[in-house]
Curated annotation (Swiss-Prot):
Name of the featured protein: Phosphoribosyl-ATP pyrophosphatase
Principal location: cytoplasm
UniProt organism field: Saccharolobus solfataricus (strain ATCC 35092 / DSM 1617 / JCM 11322 / P2) (Sulfolobus solfataricus)
This protein's record includes keyword Cytoplasm: yes
A Gene Ontology cellular-component term: cytoplasm
Gene3D superfamilies, alphabetized: MazG-like
């Protein structure tokens, strides 16, 4: 996976959080508050686990994408950037 798509999606999420456009799923979940977004991360985590154990590869990929998206929204609300995560992963690699 290219970092660029993650970085691009994160920028879109930041824009949606700032502007809160009508019809935006990101704006909708952010308007419900950080606890709601955190619960969505938990829900998507469980769905990813279930897909890995009982479903096909395409379903697993879809659930992982949902999990990553919701993690990015939660990261944005916490002020954590993808670059912060890349640095931490790099640090752990050493």
């Amino acid at each position: 996976m290219s970092n660029e798509i993650v970085d691009e999606l994160y920028k879109i999420i930041l824009d949606r959080i700032e502007k809160r456009p009508t019809g935006s799923y990101t704006a909708e979940i952010v308007n419900k508050g950080k606890p709601y977004v955190a619960r969505k991360v938990g829900e998507e985590s469980v769905e990813t686990i279930v897909a890995s154990l009982a479903e096909n590869k395409e379903r697993f990929i879809s659930e992982v994408a949902d999990l990553i998206y919701h993690l990015l929204v939660l990261m944005a609300l916490e002020g954590v950037t993808p670059e912060d995560i890349y640095r931490e992963l790099e640090r752990r690699r050493k």
